[in-house]
Amino acid sequence: HLIMQYNISPETIIGFQPELASVDRMLEGDVDFSAFDKRTMTPNGAIFRTDKPGFLGELMEKYYTDRSKYKKLMIIEQKKQQKDKGNKTISNNISKYNNIQMARKIALNSAYGAIGNKYCRYYDVRQAEGITFAGQYSIRFIQRRVNEYLNNLLKTEKIDYVVASDTDSIYIRMGDVVKKMGLGDDIKKTVNILDKFCDQKLKPYIDEKYQELADYTHAYKQKMVMDKEVIANKGIWTAKKRYILNVYNSEGVDYDEPKLKIMGIEAVSYTHLTLPTNLRV
């Protein structure tokens, strides 16, 4: 998405002026983009033309559209599975669509890796840094805006409701929202209401703020999109990218019983040698 938003591509980069920008300055709105006619700039100072599409962005668009199609098909099958759990055809379809969409995801992510690889034909550290810095800017930007939104909604001041963030995700503490709505201890009802709150209130707000970001930076396209991934009642973080969530809803699929989402943490770890129980000499 960052490649598409800033039109990052080997043939569209037209300048590099790191003294003009930084993530912090752009977050404060201190970078003047008024003179950037048909140009945009990433927070590391890489400048890209926006009067014609780059081949890399067009390629990413194709793969992203393809991935979205198969991911939607997978979610449809997952919803069916909640009503017909023993159906092997549904299980096979879920595996098939998941494999296809994951293959597209890997291909999408590999574009950044290729640009940052000195053995790649299109290696350019300015573009690789541009993607990284733009990602930091986008996440920190929306983290601020979501905190502002929830503080305003809950009539609080300077409370950090975003408890963690990743390269393309934020994790929001919604307990105070649940209390304000007076939802009580019915977890399934709470999950249902939060699902609607995210879709009808939070997501439109995020879309609006990301459009403001795109307008500010004179982006080629507004491609920053955030969708609700999971709703969980408990979570444990040991470090960045290392967490466990007790999930009741995953991408719109409601679970009868919660499932653990484990990321970056060993579910089973052996720190010593296990002796064989049957040893023949």
Q: Which residues are covered by each model-predicted region?
A:
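Catalytic palm active-site di-aspartate
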Residues: R67, I159-G175
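Short, conserved secondary-structure transition motifs
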Residues: M224-A239
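Helical catalytic core of nucleic-acid polymerases
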Residues: H1-R145, Y149, L153
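Catalytic palm subdomain of template-directed nucleic-acid polymerases
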Residues: Y171-F197
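Conserved small/polar residues in nucleotide/adenosyl-binding loops
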Residues: T271-T277
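Phosphate/diphosphate-binding loops
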Residues: Q200-E212
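Polar, glycine-rich mid-to-C-terminal structural blocks
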Residues: L245-G264
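Short, glycine/acidic-rich hinge or "gate" loops at secondary-structure transitions
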Residues: K80-K85, L150-D166, E212-M224
